């Protein structure tokens, strides 16, 4: 389940599992 900011994700990106990943293809990082 993906979550948005304010639902367990510290960044303004979708938070899938335990990782926050921006919607773009150039980034891939954890919270």
From Swiss-Prot:
| SS bond partners | 2-16, 9-20, 15-31
Modified positions (4-carboxyglutamate) are 14
Q: Which domain of life is it from?
A: Eukaryota
Q: Name one GO molecular function term.
A: ion channel regulator activity
* Tissue expression per record: Expressed by the venom duct.
The record's Gene Ontology cellular component field reads: extracellular region
Q: Which keywords does UniProt give here?
A: Disulfide bond, Gamma-carboxyglutamic acid, Ion channel impairing toxin, Knottin, Neurotoxin, Secreted, Toxin
Q: What is its main location?
A: secreted
Where is it located?
Answer: Secreted
Is Hydrolase there in the keyword field? no
- Glycoprotein keyword on record: no
**Domain text:** The presence of a 'disulfide through disulfide knot' structurally defines this protein as a knottin.
Return the similarity comment.
Belongs to the conotoxin O1 superfamily.
Job description of the protein: Gamma-conotoxins may act on voltage-gated non-specific cation pacemaker channels (HCN). Elicits toxic effects in the freshwater snail Pomacea paludosa after intramuscular injection, but it has no effect when injected intracerebrally into mice.
Q: What is this protein called?
A: Gamma-conotoxin-like As7a
Q: Which organism is it from?
A: Conus cancellatus (Cancellate cone)
